[in-house]
């Protein structure tokens, strides 16, 4: 589950904890190195089934990826201008295609490209508009 800003992480974590319990890890740049290390290991060892975080969470070492959800997909924060440059939304679509899983792009105000593709049903991505 990707969120565009770190500040949105706590409310999303609360929602997921209430529904799924303690199988959640959080990854973002505001965590200390030790916290990130602990979360990374928890994911890698299979103790976490759900990862919530900002764009860098797309690199979480999940071994059995089942779905990718991108909240507020229209937000430009999913693009990294730092090296290495990447767009987490594009990576999510690539990962979903290669793993044959759905990617859900959610937004009340979708990106115009997303809106167009949803109307045209141009690919297997699920669009929530």
Each language-model region and where it sits:
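Walker B catalytic acidic pair
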Residues: 54-55, 71-73
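Short, polar loop motifs at secondary-structure junctions
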Residues: 54-57, 110-111
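Conserved motor-coupling elements within RecA-like helicase/translocase cores
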Residues: 15-51, 59-65
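Post-DEXD/H (motif II) to motif III coupling segment of the RecA-like Helicase ATP-binding lobe
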Residues: 5, 67, 73-129
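Conserved Walker A/P-loop ATP-binding site and its immediately adjacent core
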Residues: 1-16, 35
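Alpha-helical scaffold elements adjacent to nucleotide-binding pockets in ATP/GTP-utilizing enzyme cores
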Residues: 11-15, 19, 39-42, 68, ...
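Amphipathic alpha-helical transducer elements in NTP-driven molecular machines
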Residues: 10, 24, 33-37, 62, ...
């Amino acid at each position: 589950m990707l969120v565009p800003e770190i500040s949105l992480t706590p409310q999303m974590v609360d929602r997921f904890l209430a529904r799924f319990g303690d199988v959640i890890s959080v990854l973002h740049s505001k965590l200390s190195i030790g916290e990130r290390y602990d979360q990374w290991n928890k994911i890698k060892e299979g103790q976490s089934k759900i990862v919530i975080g900002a764009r860098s969470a797309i690199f979480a070492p999940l071994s059995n990826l089942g779905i990718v959800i991108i909240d507020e997909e229209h937000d430009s924060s999913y693009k990294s201008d730092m090296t290495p440059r990447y767009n987490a939304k594009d990576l999510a679509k690539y990962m979903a295609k290669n793993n044959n899983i759905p990617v859900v792009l959610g937004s009340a105000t979708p990106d115009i490209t997303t809106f167009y593709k949803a109307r045209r049903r141009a690919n297997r991505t699920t669009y929530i508009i």
